[in-house]
Amino acid sequence: MSASTVSITASPRTIRRTPVLSGEKKSNFDFPPSESHANAAIGESSAGTNKDLIRAEAAGERSNTYDVGPVTRKSGSTATGTNTTTTQRRTRKSQGNKIDRGKWKTVVRVFAKQFGALLLLVGLIQLIRKLTLKDSSLSSSNFPIETEMVLSELESRISAVDGLVKTTTKMMQVQVEFLDKKMDSESRALRQTIDSTSSVLHSELKKVESKTERLQVSVDELNAKPLVSREELERVYEELKKGKVGDSDVNIDKLRAYARDIVEKEIGKHVADGLGRVDYALASGGAFVMGHSDPFLVGNGRNWFGTSRRRVHSKAVKMLTPSFGEPGQCFPLKGSNGYVLVRLRAPIIPEAVTLEHVSKAVAYDRSSAPKDCRVSGWLGDIDMETETMPLLTEFSYDLDRSNAQTFDIADSAHSGLVNTVRLDFNSNHGSSSHTCIYRFRVHGRELDSVSVAHA
């Protein structure tokens, strides 16, 4: 048994001893060097007093429980036989434990602060979330009403557009049906017109074919028969005998040859432009129209001044070309009086002029034929307004004669050379609106170079 144990058990229980501590007072909690410097301003006396009071209370409680005296530690020497009481000092191990405990307290304190800040932040987030959800709930409560209004307005607009589309479609269908009916009726009318026109043309072609057949038959008959029959020759012979012509002077074969020559000459005349005379006013030979009075034209033909530099209409050339007796192949001039100015293909001595109109056998109306006419001619250029135009001939066109009527120039030898001829007409056969010129011809003879030089 140790000496400390003996001292505790030997003390009577009734005696309460005051614990006396000896030795150096030290703090129960060793601060780190940084903290000890920071707390130096507070004071060491108050800290040490508080810690001594805590330590005294703890010792009193232990003494009341166990009735023991102060714990002392006796040390002796076997050599001297003496005991030494000393206060137990804290080892460096216990001081190391206190430093670790202080670090843990700092960590816990920092953690507690961070945790509190985290809790505060979480609370703020929850509060903001509740407010946001509340606002969204309020706005969502109004959303269905606005949505219904928008949807109803959209439905009304869609229905209006649908009605407009239906109405437009119906109108387009009506227009299409109307156009279809109109096109159908017009196509039927056009088809009927074409059919009627084709039937008329077909009938006219049949008439032409029949006429052609009759003409062919007539030509064949003429070719089969002699030009002069024997009966006609005998009749001519009897007449010649009555005219006191001797038999020695008359021969039937000679008469037949004479008649043949006459017929061939007449046929040659008709083949040679119908007259058998040279036309120096023929357009294909080099002649042309230099001017004319106002033409009688309708429709697009009214604008005729821009067609030529000489203010001559493009259709005026018809007056200098063969018409072949076809109605309408003429150049109409306005009114019952007018003129035509023609430049001949070459200078000539004029002998006659020919004025042609449509034949009575094929004409629809001959009231537009010219009546009283006057022809002038000269060589070169003259001023028709100031100078007198030399007169060649005057005549009247007669409807009872042939369609191509020739009028001779009485004094052609004294007229001299001419290369320009003017036809003036002062009246026609009844038409007040226009006068038609089918063809105008000028006949004469050219002089050779020697004659022209002497002239």
Curated annotation (Swiss-Prot):
PROSITE patterns: SUN (PS51469). A motif (Nuclear localization signal) lies at residues 88-95. It comes from the Eukaryota. Residues 2-105 are nuclear. The modification Phosphoserine is found at residue 63. One of its GO terms (biological process) is protein homooligomerization. The modification N-acetylserine is found at residue 2. Pfam families: Sad1_UNC. Residues 201-225 form a coiled coil. This is SUN domain-containing protein 2. Disruption phenotype: No visible phenotype. When associated with SUN1 disruption, abnormal nuclear shape in some cells such as mature root hairs but also numerous meiotic defects namely a delay in the progression of meiosis, absence of full synapsis and a reduction in the mean cell chiasma frequency. Residues 129-455 are perinuclear space. Induction: Up-regulated in proliferating tissues. Expressed in roots, hypocotyls, cotyledons and leaves and inflorescences. One of its GO terms (molecular function) is protein-membrane adaptor activity. Keywords: Acetylation, Coiled coil, Cytoplasm, Cytoskeleton, Endoplasmic reticulum, Membrane, Nucleus, Phosphoprotein, Signal-anchor, Transmembrane, Transmembrane helix. Residues 1-99 are annotated as: Disordered. Changing residue 434 to A: Strongly affects binding to SINE1, SINE2, SINE3 and SINE4. Residues 285-447 form the SUN domain.
